[in-house]
């Protein structure tokens, strides 16, 4: 996705593992935002549940706070404005990270069977894989799973202890 024209905007917790996307952001070719990784993880769960967003104190009085930098990393993001909203909830200042539709979730699985069951036993971390897939599903988006050809197996051959989700 780190090619010009494939992305319009990105909201991420860090860019260290995506140097080409980082370059697009630095060259102001995409709107780039930086949000706390934990908030992004929780936001996927909120989107998956069909809720309006994440309400939290995390990010107040930091670069994410819309009264400061709003998490905006470049001019293109500043043109769009802050993604995060500051709100008053029960007399306390909070930040609201609104839900947005997930059009496509790109996921790698260790094994996938012919019915779409996905196992993740060889992945380095489970991280947010399931909530991302669920968020795309709830949004009416697509879940695209990559797997090595030799790891596309017959239905019933997966160890069910490692099946984490189903893609149909």
Which residues fall in each region the model found?
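Conserved alpha/beta enzyme-core scaffold
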Residues: 1-168
């Amino acid at each position: 996705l780190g090619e010009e024209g494939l992305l319009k905007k990105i909201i991420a917790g860090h860019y260290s593992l995506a140097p080409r996307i980082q370059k697009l952001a630095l060259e102001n070719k995409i709107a780039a935002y930086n949000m706390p990784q934990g908030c992004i993880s929780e936001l996927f769960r909120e989107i998956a549940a069909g809720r309006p967003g994440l309400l939290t104190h995390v990010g107040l009085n930091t670069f994410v706070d819309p009264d400061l930098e709003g998490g905006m990393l470049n001019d293109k993001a500043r043109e769009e404005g802050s993604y995060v909203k500051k709100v008053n909830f029960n007399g306390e200042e909070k930040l609201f990270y609104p839900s947005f539709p997930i059009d496509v979730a790109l996921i790698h699985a260790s094994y996938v069977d012919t019915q779409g069951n996905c196992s993740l036993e060889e992945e380095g971390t489970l991280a947010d894989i399931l909530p991302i897939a669920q968020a795309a599903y709830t949004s009416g988006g697509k879940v695209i799973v990559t797997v090595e050809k030799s790891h596309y197996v017959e239905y019933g051959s997966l160890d069910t202890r490692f099946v984490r989700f189903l893609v149909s």
